[in-house]
Amino acid sequence: MSDPLPLRHIARALVFDPADRLLLIAYEAVRPIDPAKPEERCFWFMPGGGLEEGETHEAACRRELSEEIGVDDAPIGPLVATCNGPFRLFRKPRDARERYFVVRLPSDRIDTARLAETEDNPVLGTRWWTLAELEASAERIEPAGLAAVVRRVLAGDIPPGPVTLSWRDA
């Protein structure tokens, strides 16, 4: 029997620019990949990271945005989704307890100079996605169901409680 994965509480942001595009970060998966599916080497994820001792999800989200995209004092909006369970795409697999908050930026200018040093997986880049691009993409975007949440948020339909999402391989 294998040891249980370490529990990690995580805050992430659905970061939107004024054109309603969503910011995602491309990572290289470090787990073994099926040679017949080289496209699985890359996956896209929202900015964010683990909570530090005594930190709230909102404070962690704000800190991570500063570290990863150079945005200080971002206004953290509503909690719109959660995703819980084993996640194995990062170098350190974890039993993730993720919370996703809406963040609207006044421009699309970000500074990713420190992004690579804050991550344990190779960072391949960042991209602003329109809703149409997100919905049509064949690329691996985590978690499953993210596009539906983005659609609701952009329509002004903030859920009364967080929507439950799941990992693609869960």
Where are these regions (language model features)?
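Active-site-adjacent beta-strand/loop module that shapes the phosphate/pyrophosphate-binding cleft
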Residues: 84-114, 127, 152
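Nudix hydrolase/Nudix homology domain
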Residues: 42-44, 107-170
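N-terminal strand-loop-strand
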Residues: 2-46, 58
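A structural signal for short, well-ordered beta-strand segments
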Residues: 13, 79, 99-101
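The catalytic Nudix box helix
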Residues: 46-80
